[in-house]
Curated annotation (Swiss-Prot):
Coiled coil: none annotated. This is Small ribosomal subunit protein eS25. InterPro entries: Ribosomal_eS25, WH_DNA-bd_sf. Belongs to the eukaryotic ribosomal protein eS25 family. It comes from Candida albicans (strain SC5314 / ATCC MYA-2876). One of its GO terms (cellular component) is cytosolic small ribosomal subunit.
Length: 105
């Protein structure tokens, strides 16, 4: 077998520009999700909505409040603690990462 001839940098660059191969195949089309525009400061309107709507939910957690009320996660955690102190919701499971509540009986 004959020894392989070394290409110069210029020859390598020209070969790369010439193409020949398709671009790298993507796994999926990649649906882009819009950035959430949730509020981070509680106004009176959202506070009233929390007091009115949350006691009717059968399952209450931080993610439920974030999805339904469009508030930030830290704001949802504070709201859940406040509602628990007021006796509006009762804890089902309190974990370091997740807190699950239900409506008070």
């Amino acid at each position: 077998m004959a020894p392989k001839v070394q290409q110069t940098k210029a020859a390598k660059a020209a070969a790369a520009l010439a193409g020949g191969k398709k671009g790298k195949k993507k796994w999926n089309k990649g649906k882009v999700k819009d950035k959430a525009q949730h509020i981070v400061i509680l106004d009176q309107e959202k506070y009233d909505r929390i007091l009115k709507d949350v006691p009717t939910y059968k399952y209450v957690s931080v993610s439920v409040l974030v999805d339904r009320l469009k508030i930030g996660g830290s704001l949802a955690r504070v709201a859940l603690r406040q509602l628990e102190e007021d006796g509006i919701i009762t804890p089902v499971l309190k974990h370091s990462k997740q807190a699950i509540y239900t409506r008070a009986q």
